[in-house]
Amino acid sequence: MAPTTPATHDPALSHGAPPTQGSQAPANAAPNLTPADISGMQLNGLDQSQIMNLLRSLPGMFTGAKIPDQGQGNPKEDAAQTLSNLAQASSPFGGQHLPIHYQTGAAGGLPGINDPGPSTHPRGPPNLGQLSAVAMQAAPATIQHQDQQQSGRQEDGEQAGNTSIDSPSAKDGENGTGEFNQTSTSTPSGGRRGGRSATMGSDEWSRQRKDNHKEVERRRRGNINEGINELGRIVPSGSGEKAKGAILSRAVQYIHHLKENEARNIEKWTLEKLLMDQAMGDLQAQLEEIKRLWEEERMARTRLEAELEVLRNMNGVSTAGAGSGAAKDESAAGTKRRSTDGADAAGTNVEGGNNDNAEGERDGKRQRTE
């Protein structure tokens, strides 16, 4: 049965041939490599001459090893020998392990499926515990850099907050435009401070609480001042006072006055409505009575017209006969009246002649007497 792979071993590197006891050797000890093994290494696609140039450019790294000059001997064997000497030499950094970096490219990256296993790896499998330790050492540096950036932003926010707090506030009796401007000015700094999370109970947390309380109080005062100024513009002012207390007092008096007027108007409107309803009821009763009388008169007239028509039909002939008899009587009476008038006129003439004769005789007798 094959031995199991240890927990610190990379599974991607163990693909291929089964691991051996030699592959589990600690990474601290430099393996005994031959020049042939080192000559088969591929460092990121570099040839042997480039490797030698890189090794020569490193200062203070090869005090105990001799590097052949360029152009002497076989470059391939020289590079392999130099790498073998470096592997066997002690570390110049006091035994501190250097992290192994792999290039994430097509050439020289992490070993794939078709790459050789740990048994043929030139320096043995990488120690994952060592890589984790290196990562943990690099993490505090990143955290420290972030803390420095946060402290810089915090100082900027505190300066902006102090600037907004130190600005002069508006007086209590005047309009609240100054406080409203302070609120709008200090809002961005408060938003930046609120975006950071501080530890509960720390100085930064207490400072944030105080700043938030000041911001809320400033907004509340601004709203109160704005409302009082609006009341001062609405409520009629006899003396023209602009103090907040005077404005509130006048507003209360004006509200009481409006409520009293409303009560009086409601009472008056109710009485007028009752009187109007009563008058409308009386007019409706009179209208109904007039309609009834008119209907009775119309029916009586229709009845009388019908009776008159019946009487005319019944007395039509008798009326015509009575009319002809009356005409005859009138003609006879007229003839008799004319004859009587002629006789009377003749008698009157005779009497007049007789009288004239008598007077003439009396005159003659008087003349003879004289």
Curated annotation (Swiss-Prot):
Region of interest called Basic motif, as start-end residue ranges on this chain: 208-221
SMART domains referenced in this protein's UniProt entry, alphabetically: HLH
Matching Pfam families: HLH
Region (Helix-loop-helix motif): 222-258
Presence of keyword Acetylation: no
Domain bHLH: 208-258
InterPro entries tied to this protein: bHLH_dom, bHLHzip_scCBP1-like, HLH_DNA-bd_sf
Entry GO MF terms: DNA binding; DNA-binding transcription factor activity; protein dimerization activity
Name of the featured protein: Psilocybin cluster transcription regulator
Principal location: nucleus
Function description: Transcription factor that may regulate the expression of the gene cluster that mediates the biosynthesis of psilocybin, a psychotropic tryptamine-derived natural product.
Compositionally biased region (Low complexity): 183-202
UniProt lineage: Eukaryota, Fungi, Dikarya, Basidiomycota, Agaricomycotina
